[in-house]
């Protein structure tokens, strides 16, 4: 026992007294401190190691007891909930001290820990105990003490050990920041990725997939590409049904900012599937509170499931639109031919799955675009039908017989007939309660269905082939055989601008959607026709500034559409800016006069006397594709997000579908 007591006394003094003792040293120097302190886990033996097995065993037991006695207070101080204090008098009911270091603690890597455990078990029991004590001390230490420990250890490392640390740390410091960050920040990061990168991100892990597939990210992707050209990648996808885009935009934007707005009552939104045309009803975001609240940080799966809706996921919408857009790009389409008219098809329009066609055979036919079935035939005109337009409730047609007829196209009943033109009606367009009609009598007639008033717009010197109403700005565009296009003010009943440049009869005029943005980089000055010009009404008071930033009208009255397209029998298509009257671009490619024209923000479709249909990029002027098949001049075209329809004097209607 004398030997054991002496060992304990020497060890305690070596641990807690940095000054080396100069008397009472035992004969062996196992516990002698180095530089004043020596580790209690140093199991090395010196040249004076005792050969007596019993004494060696007692010393080992003493070391273990001493180690436990000195480590226990440290562990009890920093992790009292896991390690009961020894004689400290600290109440277990007292809460543990704050541990800010736990917030940044990483999750253990299972394969690495298995390998570490295997290596530990290969060591002697005493070495295992010593290493376990070191790990316990470091694990219990707060951040500041950990830094001190690490600095001391690094100071004692040799180059091979430092190399091991360097190679290990390189992998350990990699952090899964996407799942570690709040969802709204992760959404913001992912929204900067392109489509391919976003799909690859979804393959990293379940957590990444949950975030990368979220509606917040893909809604932004749809907004960036659908019905417009992306400024980053140059891709544009076909138009999506607008109601759903608007209905979910506000909710998704608030989710992206980390704020949840819960409606007082669920909102039902009717939408038409962009690929199937089937009506769908969707509930708003699920919730139980009508207040605007700050979102709490939740686990990824729980957090995203709260915001599930009955809508089709935006990623699926984007995927379908991307397939259709790719088919448009490479010309992959299926063709259906509808036969039924006995004379040339002169006008058409389609919405969803319903197609209406008008012909010189004096009839209007209603078709099911999916099945090709002729649903009904509207009869009543006594001459060829040159123009028509329909909405959900009515169809209005114009004929060479000088009449306008209003139909219930669902039943085939003719509701009313309007007369007023002195010549055949060859162009019409209505929007809201305003109807405009163009005639061979060289006039444009405006019909107001609300107050039953009518008036004429005079100014063209030849047939008026096409008209276009913009009820927002209360203006009308008209195209005429006098080779001009005119812009009319419905309030003053005056022509406020005349566009001149075509050298053939102008057959069509259409405004481009307000979302369309002309790319100035493609605007080459040499492309502008030197013959193109703009003029105003003879009255000086009706002249309008040609500055692009100048308003057309005083006050808050909206300006007319900024860009318009025209086609003429001079075989060209022209893009105009209404603010300045400039012809921005001329599209060359057709061999004969262009009779038909349709466009959206992504493409232009034209049909001509040369029996060809061409697809154009409105920004660059490039002809992307040419379709043939008709045996007569193409007299009318219609454009949708995933198809276009053509009618010809060969009595056929052809549907080019890019869905499949």
Curated annotation (Swiss-Prot):
Family: Belongs to the WD repeat MET30/SCONB/SCON-2 family.
Keywords linked to the UniProt accession: Repeat, Transcription, Transcription regulation, Ubl conjugation pathway, WD repeat
Name listed for the protein in its UniProt record: Probable E3 ubiquitin ligase complex SCF subunit sconB
Role played: Component of the SCF(sconB) E3 ubiquitin ligase complex involved in the regulation of sulfur metabolite repression, probably by mediating the inactivation or degradation of the metR transcription factor.
Species of provenance: Talaromyces marneffei (strain ATCC 18224 / CBS 334.59 / QM 7333)
Upper lineage: Eukaryota, Fungi, Dikarya, Ascomycota, Pezizomycotina
GO biological process: protein ubiquitination
Residue stretches of each WD repeat: 340-379, 381-419, 421-457, 459-500, 542-586, 587-626, 629-660
Domain F-box, residue spans: 175-221
Record InterPro entries: F-box-like_dom_sf (IPR036047), F-box_dom (IPR001810), G-protein_beta_WD-40_rep (IPR020472), Quinoprotein_ADH-like_sf (IPR011047), SCF_subunit_WD-repeat (IPR051075), WD40/YVTN_repeat-like_dom_sf (IPR015943), WD40_repeat_CS (IPR019775), WD40_rpt (IPR001680)
Assembly mode: Component of the SCF(sconB) E3 ubiquitin ligase complex.
Biased composition (Basic and acidic residues): 1-13
This protein's pathway: Protein modification; protein ubiquitination
